[in-house]
Amino acid sequence: MAKKADLSVKSERDKYWNDKAVQVFKGRRIVSVRYMGDLEAEENMWSKRGLVLKLDNGMTVIPGMDDEFNDTGVLHYVNAEGQWDCLPSL
């Protein structure tokens, strides 16, 4: 049985979350992209409408403003020329 990560230790916490991100995203393909509707935001008591990404394995990804998902978040990206941009919450 593998040792459970001690998340109070920075190196173990970093490895745990990096491994989790790899498990969730590596090799996945985004099959649809949209902004959530007003009703979806209202049902979650959010003041803004965020992006909704659907992956090829059925998983839905919604950027959040914090770990408690108090509202939707933005998605920053860097293009091939190194220019930063952002897809905002609306």
Label for each model-derived stretch:
Residues 2-90:
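Surface-exposed, interaction-prone regions used to assemble/regulate multi-protein complexes
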